[in-house]
Amino acid sequence: MDSGVKLEHMNCFQLSYQYSWTTRKKRTLKPFMSKGSSPSSSSDSRKRKLSRAEDSDDSAVKRNAKRRRKICKVEEYYEDDDCILSDWVQRNTAKRIDKRNEEVEVMVKIESGDDCTIGKWFSDVSSKRKDKRQVEVDEDEEWEEEVTLCSKIKATSSRSRTHSLSANSPENVTDVISPCRSRSPASNVSDSIQKNDCTSSRKQSGPICHQCLKGERITLLICSECEKTMFCLQCIRKWYPNLSEDDVVEKCPLCRQNCNCSKCLHLNGLIETSKRELAKSERRHHLQYLITLMLPFLNKLSIFQKLEIEFEATVQGKLPSEVEITAAISYTDERVYCDHCATSIVDLHRSCPKCSYELCLKCCQEIREGSLSERPEMKFHYVDRGHRYMHGLDAAEPSLSSTFEDEEANPSDAKWSLGENGSITCAPEKLGGCGERMLELRRILPLTWMSDLEHKAETFLSSYNISPRMLNCRCSSLETELTRKSASRTTSSDNYLFCPESLGVLKEEELLHFQEHWAKGEPVIVRNALDNTPGLSWEPMVMWRALCENVNSTSSSEMSQVKAIDCLANCEVEINTRQFFEGYSKGRTYENFWPEMLKLKDWPPSDKFEDLLPRHCDEFISALPFQEYSDPRTGILNIATKLPEGFIKPDLGPKTYIAYGIPDELGRGDSVTKLHCDMSDAVNILTHTAEVTLSQEQISSVKALKQKHKLQNKVDKQSTEDCNEKEEEEEEELNMPEISSNENEETGSALWDIFRREDVPKLEEYLRKHCKEFRHTYCSPVTKVYHPIHDQSCYLTLEHKRKLKAEYGIEPWTFVQKLGEAVFIPAGCPHQVRNLKSCTKVAVDFVSPENIHECLRLTEEFRQLPKNHKAREDKLEASLLSL
């Protein structure tokens, strides 16, 4: 790890989004040897003579006269050539005269100084000029390469090149490659200056590159589609490596709608995000389908609230119809959570009139039943034994702050006071309340709002008698063009996952096909999702440049550092942004050649993604398959889009994940997303990859370190049972392929394992049994789990997956995600991911009516976790979404 990298424990980390961008100095155009010029003149034109401050004015005049004679000579050589450089020489001469005047002024100022001051000034000037000469020589060579390429293009293409863009504008010296059209090149340039919105803000005469807004390039390619937009060769090579010069001339990136210049990247509305408009009959059918699935949950919630009203009627000695419920303070600008279980409050709840302690109806029910848990805080103390220990060597003395064992706070003796009539006293002080006043029933929504909603839903369903659309599909047990084998279970028929092409998802029968698999809780893989988009670059450096050049971003000036996660220590590291992205494409290693795996999670923050990268956001949404479900803005079957105005919507993305990766499974410090379970549905698109190849020296070092890791694991487990057998098994595993499916590792980029919902109990049992075989923070063994899945402290390696199948007879769906593929993950399905290459993924969450029951089940599961558990907060508010 670099010495400049800071390591911090990752508990509830927040990424730093403070941006900076190095301003690149404009390069100065240099004369070059064109066709027909002599080598001597070319050599003379490159020489730069340092001006001396002590030169007399007469010598300066002679030097300028000599320079003018050389200009005439150069113009003779270039008279019939495409590249007219006389104007450049004039401008460059003017610059040198200005610089000469500045030097004279400086000399006048320091005449009164001593010799040391003058000597120091001459030393600085000489050093700067020496560096500048080297830069000029390098730039000359680069420009000559471009000229050679232009000559080849001119010789092999039918396009014509203009000798002069305007007879009245001697400053236009840039070559423009344009198609043979009836329009003159001058009119093309005029249009590019007057009509191009992206460059109109830049007031510069003559042709300029649309990308870099510079007019000093030797060769510009003009688009034959719009006949006005131009790109220089350097920008094409740097920012559009997938486009050739011919492609740009045929149709420029701006016309292709994938221009990644600073201006275009911050424009929104250029990409049509919705793939098709729904007919009225389709909308009616979708709404009926949605309400049919949601109405049972609405009825259940309504019954639950009516029971609480009956308890309140008993407390007040009235009939339920006579109970008046006071409206709580408006909560439209904030989320309301239960102060005991942290679950979101939808409508009815109890509140203390003195301390405003709020309690949800579920906690009220548990208090009356005597089953309420205090949910004490959990305390994790992972031991930091140093970097040597993480790499399988001897451990250092653990720091005093990390030598405690995992422990759980002792439950307090405080108890809730429950009246005989069902009334509840405020929570004791130890639990956050005042313990004095009775909790009163409060409401958030209008009094009859829920009953009216229930009545409207039932009326709607009875008024439209639409026959259900069904598609009897058996592809889960058959290998076809629309399926991908992902498991080898002998007792079930769901080993094949539905895997359609993105071009076919717009068909109605494909949506029905998707719904049938989705209702069963099966993942779905959509191939080539990015093929339907304009092709905007998802290269991380392009995204970083867009963030840094965002003038509206308050943090764009502090982007030089990012906080990534070190996968080996599971801790935050602060690293230079450019170094991180260089490691993304080239790889990074520790001093012992063990691969260093870093990842950026939710970068930039999802709540700012649409503002900071509007074009990327629109492109991602336009690429989403089955937009009836996945569209975070207008998906008709996405329940998360149904919240009325004024309510705070849950943060469902889009979210970007950028992480390193290599094909080999390291077993320790892999670039992984550990086993977890999302409380909502999600779709994940792989937008960019970069392959990193390990050297032979690295491979040898990794193999030796793996042996040390095995020995360390045996010591940590303090067990030598069956050591010989296990050692043989592990030795075989090192030589076995990681991917057991028929996927080609060269095309695959991310290895997914998704478990079925019905296998979760056995999976949890296995994890509890083998939890100490996993490593988490500081690469320390996991000593205790509160919830084996929601703790997110385990990743099942190939060895663990084999043991899981041998002991419990279950296995996940295992497949490799390729570039451009979209993976749909149903709510309630535990899953994990390991990167086989450096990957950039973009994901968005949604809530489908088929899986709302799983969202509510997970909400109940999360509320049973300890108070400070990171998964405990009800971020989705599934109960509110069900309304």
Swiss-Prot record:
InterPro entries xref list: JHDM2-like (IPR045109), JmjC_dom (IPR003347), Znf-4CXXC_R1 (IPR018866), Znf_RING (IPR001841)
Main location: nucleus
Keywords from the UniProt entry: Iron, Metal-binding, Nucleus, Oxidoreductase, Transcription, Transcription regulation, Zinc, Zinc-finger
Organism: Arabidopsis thaliana (Mouse-ear cress)
Gene name per UniProt: JMJ29
Cellular component GO terms held in the UniProt record: nucleus
Recorded family membership: Belongs to the JARID1 histone demethylase family.
Positions with biased composition (Acidic residues): 722-735
Segments of this protein annotated with the region Disordered: 30-62, 161-204, 713-743
UniProt: Fe cation binding residues: H676, D678, H831
Organ and tissue specificity: Expressed in inflorescences, roots, siliques, leaves and stems.
Domain JmjC: 632-863
Protein task: May function as histone H3 lysine demethylase and be involved in regulation of gene expression.
Residues that coordinate or bind Zn(2+) 2: C223, C226, C252, C255
Bias (Low complexity): 34-43
Gene Ontology MF terms in the entry: chromatin DNA binding; histone H3K9 demethylase activity; oxidoreductase activity; zinc ion binding
Record protein name field: Lysine-specific demethylase JMJ29
Location(s) in or outside the cell: Nucleus
